[in-house]
Amino acid sequence: MAAYGQISSGMTVDPQVLSSSRNIGVSLSPLRRTLIGAGVRSTSISLRQCSLSVRSIKISEDSRKPKAYAENGAFDVGVLDSSSYRLADSRTSSNDSRRKTKIVCTIGPSSSSREMIWKLAEAGMNVARLNMSHGDHASHQITIDLVKEYNSLFVDKAIAIMLDTKGPEVRSGDVPQPIFLEEGQEFNFTIKRGVSLKDTVSVNYDDFVNDVEVGDILLVDGGMMSLAVKSKTSDLVKCVVIDGGELQSRRHLNVRGKSATLPSITDKDWEDIKFGVDNQVDFYAVSFVKDAKVVHELKNYLKTCSADISVIVKIESADSIKNLPSIISACDGAMVARGDLGAELPIEEVPLLQEEIIRRCRSIHKPVIVATNMLESMINHPTPTRAEVSDIAIAVREGADAIMLSGETAHGKFPLKAVNVMHTVALRTEASLPVRTSASRTTAYKGHMGQMFAFHASIMANTLSSPLIVFTRTGSMAVLLSHYRPSATIFAFTNQRRIMQRLALYQGVMPIYMEFSDDAEDTYARSLKLLQDENMLKEGQHVTLVQSGSQPIWREESTHLIQVRKIKIGG
């Protein structure tokens, strides 16, 4: 195949390629990048200004300046500009009714049966979370085995497994019966083990007395109760109740504005992490990460184990906010754990911090989860509060990859209804979002060929209202496409089961397992047939095919391709 000229507004074209019009393909490189308008016909896309007829334009990274390669097809090229968003258009007009924001469900007594895991998966669960603060390895092993059994039955459905470490939590001890704390009452915490009296309970942290000071505010169970420290001895912290409530066993304790001087990864956490390595979980959610050193320590350990597990940091302490940039850079993704975050910091800061964490993660292509109290009332009630519905919508609008259910599915009375509510609210909110891309030109393509192609593929898919199909061995192009938030689904075909599992967390990505063929056309045809058989594509619909990277499906050298095809049933 010969090169016909550099990509520019004055690109030259071999006249022999003008005769065929089977497929549409274009390399969206520096052609002023203004997408003004498109009139879609069965064999071509009409854009303004200069005309180019090709089946596909492939960019080779072998030379410094991109070269255009053309074969078979028709395409009219106009001025292409990434700033031409259809801001006035909402996604309601799209034929794609699949939810793009992912749902993380915590598995517990209410949801650990085979039947319930199946039902949660069918209702919309994308990630099964194992909370290592509760249960033992035997119970979590059952959950892992059930999720893997479910995954083995499908090539187009993937439930990822997330192991959430307990972390260095300070908790109250066990109490035989709940203790009701009343405002103004004196109440004590002791570092002596096994104490459970009407006015004193033990804590699990020997340095608790040293960490707190007179005047500190203690928050119990994420702020459900609060106490002021009045005095302390060598083994006792004496408090007065400010906000009362029912104190149950093993409630979490925070000191407002302070983090406990505990290691971020405890001995128990290391045991749980090894358990995750043995079971090949997909994600670790690491609790109370204070700095990037913790992330590097865990990643180094995983490297020695040859374990391909992504590290999600939980941002939930005052220290994590101080070190946020370095922590986000070091991790593979983040969770906005609003419960403890709102306990250690003023609650009015939490919405702003949520927005900031989402923005930082999205700017460097890392997934972000919004968690805690999303549908808290549905633990005991069949319908959510209106504020909870708005909370879900805000997380979706801010661009979170996933939203999480904790007690709602772990021990709540209505786990399936909670998932259904989250699914419905997220889907409706997504339909109202403007059709656009969110990146600036400088981040779109400067110095990164893959980002450039993902950026322009998203623009093309938005303009044509077409789904994207990406073929990936590493998941990287699917992640880049997710970053630019195209309005339609990203069907990510991969021949790696681990990559399929990992992509389950990313916004807008539907991972599908499929063996790749040496024949690119065979791989294309099988992918389209699979989607047609599952009624995910319709007759006459256009799809945007994307391939980019060092391991393309049709040849060994690094190649990039964007191609548009029209679906013909049986053709």
Swiss-Prot record:
SS bond list: none
Gene Ontology terms, MF aspect: ATP binding; kinase activity; magnesium ion binding; potassium ion binding; pyruvate kinase activity
Catalytic activity: pyruvate + ATP = phosphoenolpyruvate + ADP + H(+)
Known EC number: 2.7.1.40
Tissue expression profile of the protein: Expressed at low levels in roots, leaves, inflorescences, siliques, pollen, seeds and flowers.
Oligomer status and interactors: Oligomer of alpha and beta subunits.
Subcellular location: Plastid, Chloroplast stroma
Cofactor(s) annotated in UniProt: Mg(2+); K(+)
Designated gene of the protein: PKP3
Site (described: Transition state stabilizer): K314
Binding site for K(+): N131, S133, D164, T165
GO biological process: one example: seed maturation
Primary role: Required for plastidial pyruvate kinase activity.
Keywords assigned: ATP-binding, Chloroplast, Glycolysis, Kinase, Magnesium, Metal-binding, Nucleotide-binding, Plastid, Potassium, Pyruvate, Transferase, Transit peptide
Highest rank taxon of the organism: Eukaryota
Family: Belongs to the pyruvate kinase family.
Gene3D superfamilies on file: Phosphoenolpyruvate-binding domains (3.20.20.60), PK beta-barrel domain-like (2.40.33.10), Pyruvate kinase, C-terminal domain (3.40.1380.20)
SUPFAM superfamilies referenced in this protein's UniProt entry, alphabetically: Phosphoenolpyruvate/pyruvate domain (SSF51621), PK beta-barrel domain-like (SSF50800), PK C-terminal domain-like (SSF52935)
Positions of substrate binding: R129, K314, G339, D340, T372
pH dependence per the entry: Optimum pH is 7.8-8.0.
Amino acids binding Mg(2+): E316, D340
Positions of ATP binding: N131, M132, S133, H134, R171
Cellular component annotations (GO), alphabetically ordered: chloroplast; chloroplast stroma
Name used for this protein in its record: Plastidial pyruvate kinase 3, chloroplastic
